[in-house]
């Protein structure tokens, strides 16, 4: 008996916005990860299961073959490097942007012009390093895993690099967006060996995902 395909997803927005794509492939997830304690979820297709992992771990599970394919944000893939992954489809879901934000009243442009060395808090250290290096901005990067908006408020950092959707959280914490680094959406990533060895099983799902993403879900 052939082992079922394994799809790696993270809880939250990516999971919710992937459900219509699965539905387009005729598949429904049998349990809700927000209420279930299970990390391996069955689907209505006996040949497909879903594993729930941290968003930042999706590329690793797919790269090493623990999952055949997965859905990951561009932010995660850029930081990971994307080695060993086939990225056939931009699913156009979980859209947002990665930006630099500073406290309201902080003259970021002037600080950059004067060559000031800035402390920047982010969980996207590699992406931030490349961005600031390309612009010739001197920074000390501080890696945090959450609550980025707090860092400038307590004097830990001059600026943050984080994901922004509506900007409401920034505004609530008296921060302003000063620079967009890149637009973010979620991509389908496929293990390269699985693409060769399990192509017959994968192709109908990948095709359905592509059609649904082009049609807006």
Swiss-Prot record:
Pathway listed for it is: Amino-acid biosynthesis; L-histidine biosynthesis; L-histidine from 5-phospho-alpha-D-ribose 1-diphosphate: step 1/9
Where is this chain primarily localised? cytoplasm
Please indicate which superkingdom the organism of origin belongs to.
Answer: Bacteria
Q: Which residues form a coiled coil?
A: none
Q: Which GO terms describe its molecular function?
A: ATP binding; ATP phosphoribosyltransferase activity
Which InterPro entries does the entry link to?
Answer: ATP_PRibTrfase_cat, ATP_PRibTrfase_CS, ATP_PRibTrfase_HisG, ATP_PRibTrfase_HisG_short
Signal peptide per UniProt? none
Whether Glycoprotein counts among this entry's keywords is no
Compartments reported by the entry: Cytoplasm
Report which reactions are catalysed by this protein: 1-(5-phospho-beta-D-ribosyl)-ATP + diphosphate = 5-phospho-alpha-D-ribose 1-diphosphate + ATP
Instruction: Name the UniProt key words of this record, in alphabetical order.
Output: Amino-acid biosynthesis, ATP-binding, Cytoplasm, Glycosyltransferase, Histidine biosynthesis, Nucleotide-binding, Transferase
**Which Gene Ontology terms of cellular component type are present?**
cytoplasm
- Gene Ontology biological process terms in this record: L-histidine biosynthetic process
Give EC number(s), comma-separated.
2.4.2.17
Q: What is known of its domains?
A: Lacks the C-terminal regulatory region which is replaced by HisZ.
| Described purpose of this protein according to its UniProt entry | Catalyzes the condensation of ATP and 5-phosphoribose 1-diphosphate to form N'-(5'-phosphoribosyl)-ATP (PR-ATP). Has a crucial role in the pathway because the rate of histidine biosynthesis seems to be controlled primarily by regulation of HisG enzymatic activity.
**Name by which UniProt lists this protein:** ATP phosphoribosyltransferase
Name its species.
Burkholderia cenocepacia (strain HI2424)
The primary gene name is hisG
């Amino acid at each position: 008996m052939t082992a079922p395909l394994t799809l790696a997803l993270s809880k939250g927005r990516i999971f919710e916005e992937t459900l219509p794509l699965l539905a387009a492939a005729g598949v429904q997830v049998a349990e809700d990860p927000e209420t279930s304690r299970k990390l391996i979820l069955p689907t209505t297709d006996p040949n497909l299961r879903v594993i729930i992992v941290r968003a930042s771990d999706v590329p690793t599970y797919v790269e090493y073959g623990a999952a055949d394919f997965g859905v990951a944000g561009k932010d995660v893939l850029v930081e990971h490097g994307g080695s060993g992954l086939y990225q056939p489809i931009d699913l156009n879901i979980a859209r947002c942007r990665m930006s630099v934000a500073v406290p309201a009243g902080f003259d970021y442009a002037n600080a950059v012009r004067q060559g000031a060395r800035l402390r920047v808090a982010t969980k996207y250290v590699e992406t931030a390093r490349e961005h600031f290096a390309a612009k010739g901005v001197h920074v000390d990067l501080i890696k945090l895993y959450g609550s980025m908006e707090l860092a400038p408020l307590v004097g830990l950092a001059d600026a943050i690099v984080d994901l922004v959707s509506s900007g409401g959280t920034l505004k609530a914490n008296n921060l302003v967006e000063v620079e967009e680094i890149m637009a973010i959406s979620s991509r389908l990533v496929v293990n390269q060996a699985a693409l060769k060895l399990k192509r017959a099983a994968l192709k109908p799902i990948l095709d359905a995902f592509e059609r649904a993403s082009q049609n807006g879900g």
